[in-house]
Amino acid sequence: MRRAYVRFLVAIAATLPLAVSAATLKVGDQQLQTRGILEASGQLKDVPYQIEWFNFPAAQPLGEALNAGAIDVGGLGDAPLIFAYSAGAKIRAVSATRSTPVDLAIVVPDASPIRNAADLKGKRIATTRGSIGHYLAVATLEHANLKLTDVTLSYMQPVDAQAALATGSVDAWSTWDPYVALTEARQHTRSVANGVGVSSGLSFEAATDTAIRDKHAELADFLRRVAAGQRWALSHPDEVAAIQSRVTGLPADVLKTVYQRAQLHPVPIDNGVIAEQQRTADLYLRADVIKTRLDVAPSFDKQFSSTAP
């Protein structure tokens, strides 16, 4: 009875407005996607604590910042979370989203002779180590019955990969939106493989153990705002694209494509999500990206997911 009463009080507290806090929540973002959604949806109004934003070009440096405690929370994909967790990062996934994984793709120049995944044999593929692009390359090769030794993976950050593809230093680039949409629209590339059928489409907000303990109320409030903004963005791609274009300098038409095709939406962290994440980790083990089998269950914290609107 006492435990039930305590759970009731916690549930009630989660619905109450957060009192003004002196805390600063340090938030990691990629290409300002989360910030763009929050600004466009009005979710950054009347925030009763400070938010300090840190922008990253990819998930790998964001994961490193989480591991170092330089940020409290940040958004990253399923594979980067595994990569960071396997490296010993004291972080937990505290909320989840799912998108249509057509927003992950291996792209090649229009004039390339590469037409499908099988044609990647013997080719050079650029990607960012530990990213969802890295995962896509590994999963696509396995699906096509190719080994990692059948290709040359060149690890680099997105800006360098984009240049390498344009100059012909690599044959293909395994990446994610907005980079996929940007290269399709501005560099005349096409997709030879995407994440449909090989990727869960899951992404997460991950927080440090310290932030979960010391900034619990601020973190819970922030995650509720993110989920509300993501739901709003589903039916307002033009507004989100316009705001994010002003923030990032990326073309609004490209960003509209990103939001329309991803259909990113919040999902609860449940046993099914954890099982999908385990399969992703097991693929990384088979590909020798991580060296020992990883039990992903401890990398999740369900308490915030259960209070999301």
Q: Where do the protein language model's features map onto the residues?
A:
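Pocket-lining segment of extracytoplasmic ligand-binding domains
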Residues: A79, L153-S154, V159-R246
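Short, glycine-/small- and polar/acidic-enriched structural segments
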Residues: A23-K147, T152-Y155, D171-S174, S191-V192, ...
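Secondary-structure end/capping motifs
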Residues: D214-V289
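Extracytoplasmic/secreted envelope proteins and their assembly/folding machinery
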Residues: R35-S41, G63, N67, D78-L81, ...
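Bacterial N-terminal signal peptides that target proteins for export
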Residues: M1-I12
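N-terminal signal peptide c-region/cleavage motif recognized by signal peptidases
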Residues: P17-A19
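Conserved C-terminal helix/tail region of periplasmic/extracytoplasmic solute-binding proteins
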Residues: L285-P309
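Soluble non-cytosolic domains of exported or imported proteins
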Residues: P57-Q60, G75, T127, S131-I132, ...
